[in-house]
């Protein structure tokens, strides 16, 4: 099985909790937390939504792939990495994330995500007439890709708090021998 020094890569739909869970999981595991979307925003000097509107999705995916390559280099120390919801669209990203760490798919339902993000104006792919329908469409399109990349699929239960979810993920990593048991 894998050694205890691997990075943890979180994937899932936009709004599935990757950044929130990632921050708490990193603290729990004593690892740095990186959000690839924040790295991209620093690089472009603005919002992803603005970049999407100006440059288009293809240009964004090119930049995202470049950032994922950098964040998963062999010399990068172990970390918890929250990725953008569409990172799995590019086959190279799926392979890279899977080979360079342990991939955890946060498989939240579109309905649960919608409850959490319905007022969020920062998510470019959800700025449509029916965000819930768009989330369902993204789930249908991307679920097979998330599963292809994932080592673990975690389905957050409605009402389950972040601490309980982080505990569940940490326990799965420990049981698989990927992380040492918590003190």
From Swiss-Prot:
Per the record, the GO terms for biological process are: amino acid biosynthetic process; aromatic amino acid family biosynthetic process; chorismate biosynthetic process
Q: Could you say which residues bind Mg(2+) here?
A: 19
Q: Which domain of life is it from?
A: Bacteria
What Pfam families does the entry give? SKI
**InterPro entries named among the record's database cross-references:** P-loop_NTPase (IPR027417), Shikimate/glucono_kinase (IPR031322), Shikimate_kinase/TSH1 (IPR000623), Shikimate_kinase_CS (IPR023000)
The free-text cofactor remark is: Binds 1 Mg(2+) ion per subunit.
Identify which cofactors the protein needs according to its UniProt entry. Mg(2+)
Which of this chain's residues are annotated to bind ATP? 15-20, 123
Q: Where does substrate bind?
A: 37, 61, 85, 142
Query: Predominant location of this chain?
Result: cytoplasm
Subunit architecture: Monomer.
- Report the protein name in the record: Shikimate kinase
Gene name per UniProt: aroK
């Amino acid at each position: 099985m894998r050694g205890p020094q691997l990075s943890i890569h979180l994937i899932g739909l936009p709004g599935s909790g990757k950044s929130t869970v990632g921050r708490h999981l990193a603290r729990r595991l004593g690892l740095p937390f990186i959000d690839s979307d924040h790295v991209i925003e620093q690089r472009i000097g603005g919002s992803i939504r603005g970049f999407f509107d100006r440059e288009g999705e293809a240009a964004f995916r090119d930049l995202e792939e470049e950032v994922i390559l950098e964040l998963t280099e062999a010399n990068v120390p172990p970390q918890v990495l929250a990725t953008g919801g569409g990172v799995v669209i590019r086959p190279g990203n799926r392979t890279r994330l899977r080979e360079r760490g342990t991939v955890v798919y946060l498989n939240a339902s579109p309905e649960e995500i919608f409850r959490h993000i319905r007022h969020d104006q920062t998510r470019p792919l959800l700025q449509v007439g029916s965000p819930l329908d768009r989330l369902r469409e993204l789930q249908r399109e991307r679920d097979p890709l998330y599963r292809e990349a994932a080592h673990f699929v975690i389905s957050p239960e409605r009402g389950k708090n972040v601490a309980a979810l982080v505990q569940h993920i940490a326990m799965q990593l420990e049981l698989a021998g990927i992380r040492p048991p918590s003190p």
